[in-house]
Structures are given as C-alpha cells and as structure tokens.
C-alpha cells in the first residue's frame, strides 16, 4: 500500500511538472505579444511598391498645397490645408475634420490583417479614378468652392492606393476611407439640414412640454415661450442638433462597419443616427424648458437664466449623445441576437447528423 501511494504521488508530481513545462511556452507567447509599433512596421513592410506610393502621395499633397484653394477672400492662401484649418477652427460643426485622418489611419491599423492578406498589384485603370478626383478639384477651383476640392483631395488619395495596390485593396479599404466624407466642411450647405431639424425639434419639444408635461407654453415656429413670456427660447440653427447629428452619424458608421457584415444591417445602424440624434436634441431642449419652468415657479424671474445655464453648460451639452448611443447599442443587440437565432437551427441539425 505504501509503495502504491509513493508511486501515485510520483506520477502526480511528474504530471504537475509536465503541465508547468507546457504552460511556460504559452506564457512566453503571451508575454511576446507584438507592440503597436511592431504591428505598424509589419503592416508597412508587407506593402509592395512603397516608394511609388510615397512619390505619388507626396506629389498629390504638394499639388494641393500650392494649387488647392482659389477663394482668397476668407484666408489669403492657395493652400487647401490652410483653408481647411481656418474652416475647422471657425465652425464647431466642422471641427471633427481635424481628427478624421487619424480615425481613418487607426481603423486601417485595426484592419491590418485583412489589408495584408488581399492580393496587391499595380492597377493602371485606377488612373481613371485619379483623373476623376482631379476633375472634382478643378470644378471646385473654378467655382471657388474649396469644400468641393476637399472631396477631390480625399478621393484622390483613395484612388492612388488603388493605383499602387490594386482593386482588391480598394474594396478592402473602402471602409474606413468612407469616413473621409466627414472631413468635408458643411458650411452654408448646413442650412438645408438645420432648418428642418430646427422645426422638427421645436414641434416635438413643444408637444412633449405642452401636452405630456402640461407646461403652459406657446410655440411659434422655432420659438418656445411660456404663456406670460417670462422665458423665451428660439431653436436657432446652432441649436438644431446638426453637430450631434454629424458626430452620431460618424460614430454609427464606424460601429456599423466594425460590428456587422451584412449590408442591410450596416445601413440600418447608419440610418438610425437621424431619429436618434433628433431624440437626443429633443431631450436637451425639453430639459431647458423644464429647468426654466421649475426655477420660474420657485423664484420668479430666474427661469430664463436657469434655462440658459442648461443650454450653455458643457457637461449638459453631452446629453444628446446619451439616448443616441443607448438606442444604437440596443438596436445592435437586437440585430446580434437575430444572427445568433439564425445559427441555432444549423447547430441542431448538424448535431442530429452527427448522431446519425
């Protein structure tokens, strides 16, 4: 019995030592995970014709620096980049354009394995796309619309990658290059969006406050005030929710392409940005009216200031994003569950086949 116990103990000890020996390489592999810089180096070294791309890209960048802008009235420079900087810095609705190139590069890093595996070759038909990009810029240069030239600039970069690395690269990099669209300033074109957004937000806010909450208000177009005119708020273009719509649309586009593969699901996620952004702006406007009504009732004469505080507060200005992000994640959860339910019958049937 003692001999059997000793033998069992020895076998258990040997098994433990073997497990430790087997786990050491795994730990070494975990510790040897490549760094971000190493992964970037791997991506760059895996791309052919790098010298050709750098030469074409450098020429493209220099061209738009010296012949990119013809509207010298706003900022006295021919550089498209200086005009972009001026536009981004003077419009809060367009300042997202500063970080769009970084977002695109970051998502290219995220897709590095896919980009490395696609077949690459020099594809001369992409010269048609490059010519088309130059044509877009020429139109913008002639009509003095620098934002049109920005479209040509970004589309040209996308076309140059197709010229150097082929059509499969263009297909694989369509997203995130699609996000370059958010680097184009909206400018005066925003009026076609801000006006209907202002009216929609005003109508919904007026109905919620007046009908659901029973607040004695008067709505006249985009202006909402209480019946005694103690506080008045106008939903102007700056309060239409355009900024939150742009940010929400950009985030939803990223989320749609990253989390889903089916086109209709991606489209559903992206399109949901419009109603959810409006819902977020309505929440903010409703809180402004509520704050004004509560303080006006408690301290007469303080209602307008209370509403202005909610409007101007930096933290409270983030409120429109809360229902938007919660809504899209719920929608994404529903779509994900739909995917899982579709796979369950397949698993069951495969199990039956195995049993047979």
Give the predicted meaning of each segment.
Residues 37-56:
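N-terminal membrane topogenic signal
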Residues 65-92, 100, 192-231:
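Extracytosolic (periplasmic/ER-lumenal) interhelical loops and adjacent juxtamembrane/interface segments
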Residues 119-128, 148-153, 170-179:
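Cytoplasmic-side transmembrane-helix entry/capping segments in multi-pass membrane proteins
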Residues 138-148, 164-169, 188-192, 235-238:
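Membrane-interface helix caps and helix-loop-helix hairpins in membrane proteins
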């Amino acid at each position: 019995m003692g001999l059997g116990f000793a033998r069992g103990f020895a076998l258990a000890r040997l098994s433990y030592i073997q497990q430790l020996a087997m786990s050491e390489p795994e730990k070494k592999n975990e510790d040897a995970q490549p760094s971000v810089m190493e992964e970037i180096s791997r991506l760059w070294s895996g791309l052919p014709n790098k010298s050709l791309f750098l030469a074409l890209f450098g020429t493209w960048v220099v061209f738009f620096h010296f012949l990119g802008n013809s509207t010298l009235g706003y900022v006295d420079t021919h550089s498209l980049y200086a005009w972009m900087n001026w536009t981004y810095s003077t419009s809060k609705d367009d300042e997202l354009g500063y970080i769009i190139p970084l977002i695109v590069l970051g998502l290219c890093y995220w897709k590095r394995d896919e980009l490395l595996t696609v077949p690459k070759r020099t594809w001369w038909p992409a010269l048609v796309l490059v010519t088309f990009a130059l044509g877009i810029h020429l139109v913008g240069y002639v009509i003095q619309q620098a934002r049109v030239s920005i479209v040509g600039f970004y589309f040209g970069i996308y076309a140059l990658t197709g010229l150097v690395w082929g059509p499969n690269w263009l297909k694989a990099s369509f997203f995130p290059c699609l996000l370059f669209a958010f680097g184009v300033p909206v400018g005066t074109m925003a009026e076609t969006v801000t006006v209907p957004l202002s009216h929609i937000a005003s109508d919904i806010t007026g109905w919620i406050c007046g009908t659901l909450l029973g607040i004695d208000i008067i709505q006249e177009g985009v202006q909402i005030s209480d019946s005694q005119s103690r506080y008045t708020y106008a939903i102007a273009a700056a309060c239409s929710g355009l900024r939150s719509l742009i940010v929400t649309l950009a985030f939803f586009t990223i989320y749609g392409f990253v989390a889903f593969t089916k086109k209709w699901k991606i489209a559903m996620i992206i399109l949901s940005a419009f109603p959810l952004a409006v819902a977020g702006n309505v929440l903010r406007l409703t809180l402004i009216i509520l704050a004004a009504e509560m303080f006006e009732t408690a301290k007469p004469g303080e209602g307008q200031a209370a509403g202005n505080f909610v409007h101007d507060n930096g933290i409270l200005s983030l409120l429109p994003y809360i229902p938007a992000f919660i809504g899209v994640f719920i929608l994404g959860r529903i779509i994900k569950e739909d995917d899982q339910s579709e796979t369950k019958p397949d698993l069951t049937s495969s199990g039956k086949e195995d049993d047979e």
